């Protein structure tokens, strides 16, 4: 549906709440309420229209690669322009500027000895620090080990650059010129007290024309993979369902409106309890609205950049969501629509190791376990079975065993 033509919550421009009024007033562009914190509420689609209306020049919105200067004499023309700029800045003649370029050019900043690679440590060095560095690099190449800091830097770089400039094989999947891209930070669930307020769990790029359900389906959370039930008597039994299959309800909260996922018959309105609580005893929160998540795109929303919003799923697993940036698509961006929402950052999580071997990631957690030194206690699959069952698979002792899904699963 075209932007601005959809019925439902719209910006009122008052208090940032989406109230059903005609027109969006002065909230079509982000105005900063507090510096470096968040903007005032604005309508995403209207803001995009204003942006596209200003960029009417040839090539302003084009996603084609800029042509390389391949005309004869273009290099000489560039040199002339550089000389003119230097002459203007230094208030000197063109001849003096040309002489400065010839004497102080980059091609003059070379060592006297040719053929030396600055990345290679020479053999006959007398510096102790270079000798230590050389032995360290040789040891790394021999053992093929990479320190943790280097691994994380490589991981972050690959996440950010893996889709840069990627174009679709099918032209129908090409992003349209003038499309909006929003940067969304999904923070840790509130139960992660260490990181819940300041560490983004995931950072994604979403298109303004994408539905809220597409972002909802792309958010990975360990609570969706939990397996219900106690399996001490049947450890080999394969679970029939995970939490994501059983509890499909979820909602986003943006500017006074709860967008509930109602795509499936078993979905419930998780926001109803919050709305009833806010309306009881006149708590002063005003009147909230509800809408169907699958009926709205990001272009239909009123948002504040830098403002904390909410994503709730699995009944009570809550993630703070912050939209940090909004911009037009560029030719260097990933232009394949099918890859969005595009994950560009993901926090590296420590995995919980088995209490026995201290090597493998935990797969089981036990309670009231006479064989364990602590309660609860975590085990990998091998140690769990060796400690709690005999060679024929019979249970030894009394304990309760539950499948454990480690948050580091998404590493």
Swiss-Prot record:
Residues 1-22, 63-82 are annotated as: Disordered. InterPro entries: snRNA-activating_su3. Keywords: DNA-binding, Nucleus, Transcription, Transcription regulation. GO terms for biological process: snRNA transcription; snRNA transcription by RNA polymerase II; snRNA transcription by RNA polymerase III; transcription by RNA polymerase II; transcription by RNA polymerase III. Pfam families: SNAPC3. It is found in: Nucleus. The keyword Transcription regulation applies. The keyword Transcription regulation applies. GO terms for molecular function: bent DNA binding; DNA binding; RNA polymerase III general transcription initiation factor activity; RNA polymerase III type 3 promoter sequence-specific DNA binding. One of its GO terms (cellular component) is nucleoplasm. Part of the SNAPc complex composed of 5 subunits: SNAPC1, SNAPC2, SNAPC3, SNAPC4 and SNAPC5. SNAPC3 interacts with SNAPC1. Belongs to the SNAPC3/SRD2 family. Part of the SNAPc complex required for the transcription of both RNA polymerase II and III small-nuclear RNA genes. Binds to the proximal sequence element (PSE), a non-TATA-box basal promoter element common to these 2 types of genes. Recruits TBP and BRF2 to the U6 snRNA TATA box. This is snRNA-activating protein complex subunit 3. It comes from Homo sapiens. The gene is SNAPC3.
């Amino acid at each position: 549906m075209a932007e601005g033509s959809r019925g439902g919550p719209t910006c009122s421009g008052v208090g940032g709440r989406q109230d059903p009024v005609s027109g969006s007033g002065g909230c079509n562009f982000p105005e900063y309420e507090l510096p470096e914190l968040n903007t005032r509420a604005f309508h995403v689609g209207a803001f995009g229209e204003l942006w596209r209306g200003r960029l009417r020049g040839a090539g302003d919105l084009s996603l084609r690669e800029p042509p390389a200067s391949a005309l004869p004499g273009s290099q000489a023309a560039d040199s002339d322009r550089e000389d003119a700029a230097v002459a203007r800045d230094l208030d000197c003649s063109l001849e003096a500027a040309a002489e400065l370029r010839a004497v102080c050019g980059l091609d003059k900043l070379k060592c006297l000895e040719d053929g030396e690679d600055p990345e290679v440590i020479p053999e006959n060095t007398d510096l102790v620090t270079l000798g230590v560095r050389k032995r360290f690099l040789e040891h790394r190449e021999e053992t093929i080990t990479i320190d943790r800091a280097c691994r994380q830097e490589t991981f972050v770089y690959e996440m950010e650059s893996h889709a840069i400039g990627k174009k679709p094989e099918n032209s129908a999947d090409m992003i349209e010129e003038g499309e909006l891209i929003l940067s969304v930070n999904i923070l840790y669930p509130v139960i992660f007290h260490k990181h819940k307020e300041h560490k983004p769990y995931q950072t994604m790029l979403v298109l303004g024309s994408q539905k809220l359900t597409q972002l909802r389906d792309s958010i990975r959370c360990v609570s969706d993979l939990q397996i219900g039930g106690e399996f001490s008597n049947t450890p080999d039994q394969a679970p029939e369902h995970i939490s994501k299959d059983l509890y499909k309800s979820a909602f986003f909260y943006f500017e006074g409106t709860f967008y509930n996922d109602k795509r499936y018959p078993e979905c419930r309105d998780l926001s109803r309890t919050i709305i009833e609580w806010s309306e009881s005893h006149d708590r002063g929160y005003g009147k909230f609205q509800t809408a169907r998540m699958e009926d709205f795109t990001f272009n239909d929303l009123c948002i504040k950049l830098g403002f904390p919003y909410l994503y709730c799923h699995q009944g009570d697993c809550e993630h703070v969501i912050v939209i940090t940036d909004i911009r037009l698509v560029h030719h260097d961006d990933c232009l394949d629509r099918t890859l969005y929402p595009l994950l560009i950052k993901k926090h590296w999580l420590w995995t919980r190791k088995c209490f026995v071997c201290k090597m493998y990631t935990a797969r089981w957690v036990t309670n009231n376990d006479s064989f364990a030194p602590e309660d609860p206690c975590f085990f990998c699959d091998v140690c769990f079975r060796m400690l709690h069952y005999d060679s024929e698979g019979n249970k030894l002792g009394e304990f309760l065993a539950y499948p454990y899904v480690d948050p580091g699963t998404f590493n």
